[in-house]
Design a protein with these regions (language model features):
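P-loop (Walker A) phosphate-binding loop of NTP-binding proteins
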Residues: 2-3
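Conserved lysine of the Walker
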Residues: 8
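Hydrophobic positions on the alpha1 helix immediately C-terminal to the Walker A/P-loop
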Residues: 11
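Post-Walker A helix-loop "phosphate-sensing" segment adjacent to the P-loop in P-loop NTPases
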Residues: 16-25
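Conserved nucleotide-sensing/catalytic segment adjacent to the nucleotide-binding pocket
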Residues: 25-28, 34-82, 97
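Phosphate-binding/switch loop-helix module in NTP-utilizing enzymes
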Residues: 63-100, 105-106, 192-199
Length: 204
């Protein structure tokens, strides 16, 4: 978990690269926004994607539980253009390691209870704003004025109310100030050790 622009995706990528190939399934929380196909487009466009009510928590928890029990799942996909779920799904096979990535990955208790290791990526507000501006102006073509208004009116208040408080549930807090190689190595060692112990228990 961690605020928008905190560097979650980078941290996840580094963890995946540090672990054995094909041992990790990454589940993006963004795929589990509510299906709003029953609503008109003008209503869907008003969706606050940074509020907990935007997510179908029960489906996310159900699919994580199924992956943990060795079952494959059909992960939903979401379109920010139509602001609703797409008919296509992504087939996800169970893996030794399952990573849930998202701003509120630690928000829902049912989901937290399925996690063996909870990580929060901590980055200062100014740095997060700069990263969001850089990402959304370059990659998504959003006007700067719109991004600043969105940060002030949506991102910051939602972060302060719903995202930042979930830090209390984290087992590890990573200050994302650049090189976090030692933290990644620590997590790699912990995760691989945990997987080994779980496999030993299953063999008994």
């Amino acid at each position: 978990a961690g605020g928008s622009g905190s560097g979650k995706t980078t941290v996840v990528r580094k963890i995946v690269e540090a672990l054995p190939e094909n041992s990790v399934a990454v589940i993006p929380q963004d795929s589990y926004y509510n299906d709003q196909s029953h609503l008109p487009l003008d209503v869907r466009k008003l969706t606050n994607f940074d509020h907990p009510n935007a997510f179908e928590w029960s489906l996310l928890a159900k699919q994580i539980e199924e992956l943990r029990s060795g079952k494959a799942v059909e992960q939903p996909t979401y379109s920010y253009i139509t602001c609703t779920r797409l008919p296509e799904t992504v087939h996800v096979e169970p893996h030794d390691v399952i990573i849930v990535e998202g701003i509120m990955a630690l928000y829902d208790k049912q989901l937290r209870d399925l996690m063996d290791l909870k990580i929060y990526v901590e980055t200062g507000a100014d740095e997060r704003l700069l990263r969001v501006i850089q990402r959304d102006t370059v990659e998504r073509g959003h006007p700067l004025e719109m991004l600043i208004a969105k940060y002030r009116n949506v991102l910051k208040p939602m972060h302060d109310e719903f995202v930042a408080p979930t830090k209390q549930y984290a087992d590890i807090i990573i200050p994302n100030l650049g090189d976090n190689g030692s933290a990644i190595e620590m997590m790699r060692a912990y995760i691989q050790g945990f997987v080994r112990e779980q496999k030993k228990k299953e063999q008994k």
